[in-house]
């Protein structure tokens, strides 16, 4: 899959680019590594997803926008709960996928899905939530078994959190 370093520079490039869900191609300029690393773009995507999901969860926990407008003090209790839910249920889930993929030497980065995030925000206004915030994009030469393990580790993380 790797072209190797070019003669003009020593950056490694992959043969193809994958869509990031926002309409931009993802440029890969380094070899995959088992060390957990984050690009600046990935950090921005995670921050935006966490922010929008926190607002959406806050509204859903408050039974929609109307109760929040009638009693803004609801936010004092619901916002911290929503943030904790997003950090444990969403962020740890996505980081588990990323960590496992990188353990297999794959390139792995989270990409947000604007449509899924805005849909979640729109639905939360009415007091319920359906979220498809994004996914960890994985690229590398792995077996079907390894791919299955990468896919399973996110939900297993959520199950472990629920047990605790």
Tell me the role of every PLM-derived stretch:
Residues 1-164:
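Hydrophobic transmembrane alpha-helices and their immediate loop junctions
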């Amino acid at each position: 899959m790797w072209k190797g370093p070019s003669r003009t520079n020593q950056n490694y490039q992959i043969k193809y680019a994958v869509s990031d869900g926002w309409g931009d191609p993802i440029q890969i300029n380094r070899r995959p590594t088992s060390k957990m690393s984050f690009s600046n773009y990935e950090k921005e995507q995670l921050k935006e997803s966490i922010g929008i999901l926190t607002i959406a969860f806050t509204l859903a926990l408050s039974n929609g926008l109307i109760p929040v407008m009638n009693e803004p003090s609801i936010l004092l209790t619901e916002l911290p709960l929503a943030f904790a839910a997003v950090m444990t249920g969403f962020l740890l889930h996505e980081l588990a996928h990323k960590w496992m993929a990188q353990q297999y030497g794959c390139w792995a980065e989270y990409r947000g899905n604007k449509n899924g995030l805005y849909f979640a925000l729109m639905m939360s206004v009415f007091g319920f939530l359906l979220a498809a915030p994004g996914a960890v994009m994985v690229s590398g030469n792995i077996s079907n078994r390894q791919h299955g393990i990468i896919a399973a580790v996110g939900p297993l993380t959520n199950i472990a959190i629920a047990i605790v």
